């Protein structure tokens, strides 16, 4: 959050009190990056470890300090402070607690402008995702059917043409490849998309300096089998159970935790007999900076996410079922918590397999 310029290789500490001026403890040879530190705020300098420990004790002794750590590594994305540093701060006389809720409030909340940017990106991503599946269907019976890699490249071209940016991907996968949740095609290794295939397209993009939209669309190149329809319905209904819980709690202004939303989706898929094949969390934080953000995740499988979904945070909802060596299906939408309602994007999210 400090976004310090230049090189910093030595330890530094910044204490931000509830009231009063912040204090920075910095190394004597690394003063350049701190040139922008306001003069009215305190900045201490040290060279020796003895002076560092003394200054730290002067600042934090007897205080309750929030730091980026997660007790028991319950949420590893928040567990960023080395164990030795925690010991150092505690030995200086401070009581250390997790900053998890502060991260949600001060780092993960979207502005109105960011929400609007996300909504625009979501509309564009939804259009491109569906167009990609239809394109694959139209080429399946031709003399030149598309490969997964070719369709991936087409999607990236559409992003660029629409003024959107992405970091990598998207995921384009058929059949057994789709059973790997993080599969990505490559030019040298990519399956051909043929009639009869189940096609998964997971794509994400944003406007420049905007908030990502992250969606997964499922297609069937020809009528799906009864088994495939059953899997799709389990995934879709699990997604909708998560959305329903969010809508009920937020409209009633009742708290809801990320882990509870994961439980709601997982209960439906488990009841349908596919619980053992839903092998990842239901969703991840999407914060103003990162696709996989630092706010509350929709997770009670991989991690114990007990943070509340507070107004202003965004996240994905993406349950899936993966039968190794056979087929994988996932449905992904995004959620944003408003004051008394939940925004789901895209607004016209997928209800049925897109048969092409």
Feature locations, PLM:
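Active-site neighborhoods and metal-handling regions in enzymes and metal-associated proteins
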Residues: 1-356
């Amino acid at each position: 959050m400090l976004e310090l310029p230049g090189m910093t290789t030595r330890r530094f500490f910044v204490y931000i009190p509830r009231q009063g001026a912040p204090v920075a403890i910095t190394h004597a040879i690394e003063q350049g990056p701190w040139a922008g530190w306001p003069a009215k705020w305190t900045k201490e300098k040290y060279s020796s470890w003895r002076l560092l420990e003394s200054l730290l004790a002067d600042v934090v002794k007897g205080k309750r300090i929030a730091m980026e750590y997660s007790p028991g590594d319950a949420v590893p994305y928040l567990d960023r402070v080395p164990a030795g540093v925690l010991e150092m701060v505690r030995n200086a006389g401070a009581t250390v607690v997790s900053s998890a809720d502060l991260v949600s409030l001060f780092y993960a909340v979207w502005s109105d402008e960011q929400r609007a940017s996300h909504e625009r990106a979501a509309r564009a991503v939804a259009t491109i995702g569906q167009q990609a599946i239809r394109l694959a269907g139209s080429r399946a019976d031709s003399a030149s059917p598309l490969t997964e890699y070719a369709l991936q490249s087409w999607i990236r071209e559409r992003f660029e043409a629409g003024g959107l940016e992405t970091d990598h991907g998207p995921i384009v996968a058929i059949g057994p490849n789709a059973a790997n949740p993080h599969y990505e095609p490559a030019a040298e290794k990519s399956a051909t998309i043929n009639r009869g295939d189940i096609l998964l397209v997971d794509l994400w993009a944003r406007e420049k300096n905007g908030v990502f939209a992250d969606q997964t669309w499922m297609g069937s190149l020809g009528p799906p089998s009864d088994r495939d329809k059953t899997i799709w319905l389990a995934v879709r209904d699990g997604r909708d159970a998560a959305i329903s819980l969010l809508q009920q709690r937020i409209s009633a202004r009742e708290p809801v935790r990320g882990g509870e939303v994961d439980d709601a989706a997982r209960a439906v898929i488990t009841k349908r007999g596919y619980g053992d094949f839903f092998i990842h969390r239901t969703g991840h934080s999407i914060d103003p900076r990162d696709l996989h953000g630092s706010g509350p995740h929709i997770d009670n499988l991989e991690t114990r996410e007990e943070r509340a979904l507070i107004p202003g945070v965004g996240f994905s909802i993406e349950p899936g079922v993966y039968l190794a060596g056979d087929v994988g299906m996932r449905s992904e939408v995004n959620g944003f918590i408003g004051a008394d309602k939940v925004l789901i994007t895209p607004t016209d999210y997928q209800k049925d397999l897109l048969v092409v």
